[in-house]
Amino acid sequence: MVLFYTLHTTKRRRNMKKQGFGTTKDGKEALLYTLSNKNGMEISVTDYGAHLVSVLVPDKDGKKRDVVLGFDSVTGYETDGSHFGATIGRNGNRIAGAAFELHGKTYQLAKNENNNNLHSGPDGYDYRLWKV
């Protein structure tokens, strides 16, 4: 997020491009936002799950290199369980048995990794279409 803030200020807004990133399983259009700066750096973020899709930085010879793992369309993020570049929430990591106790009350969560809840399950932040 610090990187995002550094690249995206009101003054630099003209350096933001928006383009289609595919259609979600439920028929909604996902968008890709690409921000760039004067140093040749670019980041791309999709509104689907607020995934960081790519970070292009110039190498020692000035050639741009992508330094993060990501997919070319929203389909990859919907079907692959790796959570590349994901905004994770409400909980991160695994909750064993997909249940936890708080103040004497047991809460059952959705199971999405064997018998566990991983990164908030199938309704985590990384599976939602965000408003930008």
Model-derived segments and spans:
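Surface-exposed acidic/polar loop and edge beta-strand patches at domain peripheries
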Residues: 15-132
